[in-house]
Amino acid sequence: MWFLWILATFIFAKTKSRFYVSVFILTNMMASIHQITAYFTLNAAYVMFFAAAFVYAGSLGMHKRLRNIVIHLTAAAAYGFIFLFALYDPVWFIIKPEWAAVILLTVITLSVEGRFPERLCLFVLGMCQGELLYAAVIRNIAGAAAVGDYKWLSGCSAGVILLVGLTTYEQLAARISQKSKKQGKGATKMS
C-alpha cells in the first residue's frame, strides 16, 4: 500500500483525481487495522475497497452492460476457485495461491478491458467478490473466516501496481510504435 501511495502522491501527474486517490489510499492504510463484525469479520480497508469499486463501477456505467457483470462475476469465481483448489489440493501450487489469483485476475482484466479505469474497477471488484465467495464457502467448513485480511490487502495492492505498470507499458509501446511509423513515413517520402 505504501508503494501505491508513493506512486499516487509523487509520480502521477498533478490532477484533482490524484489527490482523491492519495487520500483514499492513506485512509485505507489507516483503516486496515480495524475490523467490522457482521455475518463475517470484515477488514475496514476491504469494505472501503469494495464500496469504492462499486461506486466507481456505477459512475462508469459498468452495471448497465451485461458483459461487465458477467466478466466481474467470472473474475470473482476464478479468485474463489484458485483458493479452494489450493485448500483441497495444495500440491499443485508452485507459487503462493495469493500470487496465482493476482496473476490470473490481472490476465483476465487485461484481456477483456481496454481502458485503465475499467481494468482497475474490474480487478478490485473481482478480488473483493472472490474473497467474499471464498469466505462464504470456507465458513461452512472451518467456521468464521476474516474477509479482507492483510494477505488480501497485499495481493490487491500488488495487483493494482501490476495493472498500473502493464497499462503504462502498453501506452509507452503504442507511443514508440506511433513515433517509429511517423519516422518511417518521412523516410519513404524522401526517397
Predicted regions and their residues:
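Structural signature of hydrophobic alpha-helical transmembrane segments
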Residues: 1-2, 36-49, 90-100
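C-terminal transmembrane helix-loop-helix hairpin of multi-pass membrane proteins
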Residues: 2, 112-191
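Hydrophobic cores of alpha-helical transmembrane segments in multi-pass inner/ER membrane proteins
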Residues: 2-11, 48-61, 103-113, 156-171
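Short juxtamembrane and helix-loop transition motifs at transmembrane-helix boundaries
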Residues: 2-14, 27-38, 53-65, 78-91, ...
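Pore- and pathway-forming membrane helices of multi-pass small-molecule/ion transporters and channels
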Residues: 5-10, 21-33, 49-54, 77, ...
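Acidic, metal/ion-handling microdomains and their immediate structural contexts
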Residues: 15-21
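Membrane-proximal helix-loop-helix units in multi-pass membrane proteins
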Residues: 61-129
